[in-house]
Amino acid sequence: MEEEEIRTWSFPEEVWQVATQPDSQQQHEDQHLSHTFLDKKDWTGNELHECNELGKKLHQNPNLLPSKQQVRTRDLCRKSLMCNLDFTPNAYLARRRFQCDGHGNFFSVRNLKLHLQERIHAEVTSVEVL
């Protein structure tokens, strides 16, 4: 008797619809506060961060690192800088601890999300002056 009841059940079409990945990605992207566009050469070149004041430069290897691996770099003034990179196959997420503004000032970037699509853009959620 239960089998007959189950066979006659019907469900609204919305129950069977599954949220697609692009829909969930769009909702996630809509929650971010601001967008900053980067040039592709900044991401693929040998120098990702550059500071021109008094010849100071920051160098970072452009090779992608496994998730949660930490990289330590130093500029010409011997300031120790730490960079944490997190990458996922679909979204390429990166979290950096520092960024140079071009005038010799370093900023702490708490959350930076990079999308590698037709254009590269970054979303910065909070910045502190060091």
From Swiss-Prot:
Record's protein name: Putative protein ZNF815
Lineage: Eukaryota, Metazoa, Chordata, Craniata, Vertebrata
UniProt gene name: ZNF815P
